[in-house]
Regions:
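Alpha-helical transmembrane segments and their membrane-interface boundaries
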Residues: 1-132, 136-163, 296-325, 329, ...
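Cytosolic regulatory and coupling regions of membrane transport/channel systems
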Residues: 1-30, 34-37, 162, 166-409, ...
Length: 656
């Protein structure tokens, strides 16, 4: 029988065709519909179309940053880039009015260097850098009657309006509880679901993927609960309960990781306890009896102890119905109440290491240490920040120079487009160029068709509202997002009094794509792949700190869990950067060859360290399997880092 014909696509093309999956975020769709469109309508009715254009632009860019998560996190994720965008508008407007083409290009290039370097810090900083540069180009080139400070205020008002909608509108089904924390509640419940999925996958081929999914769920919940607040500690019982439930998930995640590392399949009942806890988080009801695993190996004993601790935590914070506490020791399904080890563990819940660590984590915070100014400065000025800043500055400045040389009325489109193309943390360069070109052509053609038949300005306002509603769905693929944003921006341009510009928009975008492709592949000073190398070094340091703590025999569970979370978070960031770099064209991808193997070894090292921690808690000593595995992984790490051209790992890591 002939084999089916298949074609292996290159990584850069595979990435360009890949789209995110998931349910439609209807609450974000509603916010998008109520954001830019109504603001523009109010301005049109008041006869201030230019004001409406600025406010709608602020709301549109805020909508791109309106992602799932808690309300507090949304304020930070939307507000910080909005402030950066307002700053860019002020700088761009006054620079465009008072400077010639050459000094203006130099100013924009310097802004690109700064914004690119800052973008290496993280997603929020990257969003701020993007809005700073886009708004600076718009301020310098878009002809509007308002002075720079007024443009900035109206731009901020658009973003602030979306924040108000994010804070005020409850998500579906959230009114049954304190809807202020619906995002946190979903995030914590997802952690327990991810633990159950990992336990169910133990011993199978999907265990590695499930462990990565657990890391993502823990990162998301940690960010949701550690969002910006006016007070240092949780101020409401609902928030304190969620923080305690998150802290109770950490020993469960640790035990599940150790069991997955062991490689043995587990009975189906092992995953039922975390699933019931996930339901309890979502509903606010007691968790009920939890099936207890057989206490036959250290990992299962750790899982059992963590389940008992979680049940007690949920009982203290959940709704009580009288009588025996659901989930208490007497009702643990299949558990003998006389188990000596468990009785000793829970005889004094205030002094055992597990309970003490959970209380410290829930009370003092979920991060190992807050970001300090020196650490941020090191990231910005380090190899990753320098490479990022140089690449963005070169493409942004070159686009601005070419655009002004062409004397096009919409010259600001060229540098603004380059910003969305060149930022490495947003995706591979060639993938974004292909999607940007395709999305712009599609969006411009769609808008040209609507502009020919819609009444003005009411039809254009409706088009802005519909496009705003589609942004949360379109963000799953860059081409779709580009098409929707193109329609929205072209509608705003016409409402502002300029002629229909679909065809010039296509030409400007294709020119920007060509500039970025050429400039982005030019030789750069220093070693390429600096962002990947910097993140791998950070992951290596975090893995080293975690391994050192575990092997020291310290009994501080809160510190151990924080170090473990830090190690897995840094590894996830490094893995994401490596995957993006691998999807570049071969001329760029070759600079990070071998880094994927280093990340995989570090992941196995952290998994093994977790298994060692669980075993040391149970027996106080490691087995030959643990020590031999650690030695093998450390030797592999040295060899792989050498092949990838990375610096040697810390000497004390190798001597561990």
């Amino acid at each position: 029988m002939p084999r089916p014909f298949s074609v292996a696509l290159p990584p850069w093309l595979t990435h360009a065709l890949r789209a995110q999956r998931g349910p439609v975020p209807w609450n974000a769709v509603l916010r998008g519909a109520l954001a830019a469109g109504p603001l523009l309508l109010a301005a049109v009715l008041a006869g201030r179309e230019s004001v409406g254009v600025m406010a709608a632009l602020g709301a549109m860019l805020a909508g791109i940053n309106d992602r799932p998560g808690s309300r507090r996190t949304a304020v930070h994720r939307i507000g910080v880039p909005g402030l950066a965008g307002a700053t860019g508008l002020v700088v761009g407007t006054y620079a465009g009015e008072g400077l010639g083409a050459v000094p203006l290009t130099l100013i924009l290039t310097a802004l690109g260097l700064l914004a690119g370097a800052v973008s290496a810090v993280g997603p929020v900083s990257s969003g701020a850098g993007t809005q700073l540069l886009v708004a600076a180009a718009i301020g310098a080139g878009m002809p509007l009657p308002e002075p720079g400070w007024q443009r900035a205020l109206f731009f901020l008002a658009g973003g602030a309006w979306l924040i108000v909608l994010r804070l005020a509108l409850p998500t579906p089904g959230a009114l049954a509880h304190d809807f202020r924390f619906d995002g946190e509640r979903v995030a914590v419940a997802d952690v327990y679901d991810a633990i159950a999925e990992l336990l169910a996958a133990a011993g199978g081929e999907q265990a590695g993927a499930r462990r990565a999914a657990l890391t993502a769920a823990l990162d998301h919940a940690q960010d949701a609960l550690a969002g910006p607040r006016l007070r240092r500690y949780a101020s409401s019982s609902a928030e304190r309960r969620l923080r305690a439930q998150y802290a109770a998930a950490l020993p469960l995640a640790e035990a599940a990781t150790a069991l997955a590392w062991a490689g043995d399949a587990l009975p189906a009942r092992t995953a039922k306890g975390p699933r019931r806890l996930a339901v309890a988080v979502r509903t606010g009801e007691p968790c009920g009896p939890l099936p207890a695993p057989a206490r036959s190996v250290p990992g299962l004993r750790a899982l059992d102890d963590a389940l008992l601790h979680a049940a007690e935590t949920f009982d203290r914070g959940g709704k009580q119905t009288g009588g025996r506490k659901p989930g208490s020791r007497q009702e643990i399904d299949g558990k003998k109440a006389g188990d000596e080890h468990g009785a000793a563990l829970h005889s004094d819940t205030g002094t055992n290491p597990l309970d003490r660590g959970a209380r410290q984590t829930a009370h003092k915070g979920l991060r190992l240490r807050p970001l300090r100014a020196k650490a941020l400065l090191r990231t910005v000025t380090g190899p990753g920040g320098r490479e990022y800043g140089f690449r963005v500055a070169l493409c942004y400045g070159a686009s601005a120079a070419v655009a002004q040389a062409l004397h096009h009325v919409h010259w600001y489109w060229l540098p603004a487009t380059a910003v969305f193309l060149v930022k490495p943390d947003l995706g591979p360069l060639v993938s974004r160029v292909l999607n940007r070109a395709a999305g712009t052509v599609l969006g411009a053609l769609v808008f040209a068709g609507f502009a020919a038949v819609l009444p003005r300005p009411e039809g254009l306002v409706a088009l802005v509202a519909i496009s705003g509603a589609l942004i949360p769905v379109a963000t799953r693929h860059f081409a779709a997002q580009t098409a929707v944003v193109t329609v929205l921006v072209l509608a705003l341009v016409m409402v502002g009094g300029e002629p229909e510009a679909s065809w010039s928009r296509i030409g400007e975008t294709l020119l920007a794509c060509a500039i970025v492709l050429i400039v982005g592949h030019l030789p750069a000073p220093g070693q390429r792949g600096g962002n990947v190398r910097a993140r791998l070094d950070a992951a290596t340091d975090a893995a080293h700190a975690y391994l050192t703590h575990v092997l020291s025999g310290a009994d501080d569970r809160a510190a151990r869990w924080a170090l473990r979370r830090e190690a897995y978070r840094k590894l996830a960031e490094a893995r994401a950067a490596i995957d993006r770099a691998a999807a570049e064209l071969p001329t760029l991808a070759r600079h990070t060859e071998g880094t994927g193997e280093v990340a995989a070894t570090l992941e196995r090292l952290v998994d093994t360290t977790t298994a060692c921690a669980v075993h040391l808690d149970d027996t106080g000593r490691l087995t030959p399997r643990h020590t031999e595995r650690l030695a093998t992984l450390l030797d592999e790490l040295v060899e792989q880092r050498e092949r990838a051209g990375l610096a040697d790992p810390p000497a004390d890591l190798l001597s561990a």
